[in-house]
Amino acid sequence: YEFVNSFQLRNEAGALVPYQIVSIRRNQMRQFQWNVFRRYDVYRVAFRTKLRAAGWTTLRLEPSPDFVRSYRTMRTSQRSATNGILRLDFHPEGTFDVTDLRSGRSFRNWNEFRFDREIGDGWNHVEPIGNAALLCSSESSLRVTLDGPERTTFEITRRYRLPASLRYEGGLGENYVGIRESEEFAEVAIRTMVTLDRDSDQLGLHFAIENHAEDFRLQLIAPTGIPGNCFAGQNFAILNRKAGRELGDATEGGFEREFIEKNISGLIGKRDASGGV
């Protein structure tokens, strides 16, 4: 068994605010006043409220004489959940679909990754001749790490097995032969935390990578199914950009080729008259 305090949250009007306990860190030393320290159990909770612009929002925590629990959940099956605005459907291979229930539009097969080799200069991507790309994971798993009426979090773990590095090989007489992948293999594990909040049209995504390989480029694949241009954040502006290469194949014979990837400042997406992502 585990000891859990019973308490309530109330807003400024005195109304109860539903919450969900996310985690408890026990026996934590915290500064109470000046050089006075006390030992606490630190509760991390999830709840929904409104924050005033250029002001503050007050919540009151008070002990509860009754047990505080909820049997409600946003999950609709083993591998799906909805908050009435968005619906999530997870697949055994480690991808998931997002459906906007307001428009009925679905964005499918998210959480795909692509590995290929990298011999660039740190500024531009350059691939070696005979560049091989790894497109599928060798193992995937799905866990529900948080399940309640306010927040539901799924954790996807995908493991990729790829050659550990590139080798610059020599031949007889120490002549340089070329670049090839090593015969030793290494594993790259990618954990994706997908968080769905009550009454929210935003999906929380957090990625954690455990890497034991080198000399590769990792790309996140997020298909939208929306044709046309994209928009990208830049300093003090949102720019419309052509999907793919702006110049098409015009730089095939040039000294410096045009790269598909362009720099962005924290925002990129696609949209049409029905919305976007």
Language-model segments: residues:
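Polysaccharide-binding surfaces and accessory modules of carbohydrate-active proteins
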Residues: 3-5, 222-277
